[in-house]
């Protein structure tokens, strides 16, 4: 007896091909009709007229037969399409009864199904999302917190199954007179494959002097997955912004998640969340950017997460940038995370925020692992228009073998004192000392930081290093003699750091030594009517070296601020430099510089430079810099924080195994940056959170990046959450769409949560879930935002393809938002996604 099988996807493809063929034939027939159905006679005689009539009749008969054939063709294609759909429906119907009793048994005995998604927590209750099926399933999203005097906490996202994404944390509830509710924590990723859930955004606070809610922590990663991104801090138009949530810890081989951005507040920005710790073999996560303020001080950037204990060269996370303030002081940059216990480089310190009255201090670079690794570069100090610039951060200490970190440049001032540069770290056994950071221009100008000493066995001193012992001085003289021929022929030494660009000139930093050495910091741009552009950081040494930090853009006293310089690239081993911050401008803030690319084999990609605000919001802010590209194993760098009216920077792309970087957060109603795309085998980066605004519209969340083409189980990045609109009659920002999973085996990223709104307003629409690969779950739709009058709607959810569950529909926002419908299951096995609540 013979057996016949039907593949619905093959039937559907054949129907599509036949429909295309039908269109081509119809077009050809139509083109021929005019020349074959009404021929002109060759002459006026009867024979010519008869010949023309004969051939015209043949043409008309052909057209009539073609019309009948076309009708039959259309009926055949319709029957084929219907047959494919019937086969698919029959397969799904046959599978569902088989799964139902199995799932019922597991539900009764364990509280979760074998295959299927966890349920969403109901909006306005703060209920936790249910865990996904033990084998295949996404965790449900946490319910949003209740509105009240103090906002209620959002529910935690449910954990993914063995294969599945963790659910997003619920948004914190709105507070009428007290503190906004805390966002729920993201759910843990599936133990084998899947993405960790994003922390929920904190709730906003409406009363004078109140504080926005803290963002929820990102979920922990699975075996290969990175930790989830922390939720954005809640905003307030009359108080202090909430702190961003901490990034989740990475799985065994995963990196820590990026900390959430601090919330906007009139009287003080919220602190950025700390980056998550890397898994045992993973890199640390980047700290979140501090929130923007208008009257007081911007929020401090979050600290970078530490790399895993046994990480083989993975770096600690970079510190987050401090929040800016167009009328007050800038926030301090976060300190860089430390490298692994034995191996790994320290993370770069965060650049500080720009401030009208005073610039914030740059964050210190992280220290390296005990044996091998470079110290992290110190963050640049922030510039100021009226007061003193911010002090540069100190460079981090290296391992026994490795270069010390450069000190950060001091911030410049248009009408006050320039700040001192940060001190460079000192080498230990083999490695160069770090350059001292250049002082900022001003009246008076800041002093340069002290350079670090070279290693006791081999290594050049950093620039501006103090005098040392006679033996060490002799060592430096010998190295100078060795370097002279190479320096004369190529313009760079064999061993040693490149020189810093001169402050106030926008000169590029010099390249590091051909063997090993850090690139010099770019000089900050000149202060003038229009600020000058900052110089690019120098490239690291070919074998080993950190790229120099890009110079900050100059201050524009009557016009536009200067553009920050590009961070220097590392070559084989080393981290890329941080992009320079844009300069303050009276009319327009300067754009941030792009982060430097990571070393091919080891090292972290540089963070994009933050964009500058214009003084007192007279004009627009600059565009934030994009993160640098990762190496073979490193993730792309995070995008910089956006300026007023300008989007956050795009996350850098992975190269081979690395994930895309997180998009930068928007500021004051600007959109978040898109997450970077994963490398060939990497996951997509999470989109940046949209900026909250005291105006009419919150910024839209950035789209999640797509996973790599050959990613095995990696997920598309989650969409960023929409920003809150605090003004009466405003509308919350739209959540970003989730990124697509790998083409063969990958999960769609979850859509971002829509932004909340104030009195007489509407919540933002949740983002669409990302599409799955042939094997994998569709991404969950984002929840609609809270609306005092009308809650935001949820968006569409992709279906699974062959094996996997459809994504859950997102919840509608509290106060009448429309929930989304769940996606359909895969053709072979899987469960339909659950409808939103």
Swiss-Prot record:
Keywords: Repeat
Domain PE residue range list: 4-94
One Pfam short name: PE
Region (Disordered): 811-837
Name of protein: PE-PGRS family protein PE_PGRS4
Low complexity compositional bias, start-end: 826-837
N-terminal signal peptide: none
Record organism: Mycobacterium tuberculosis (strain ATCC 25618 / H37Rv)
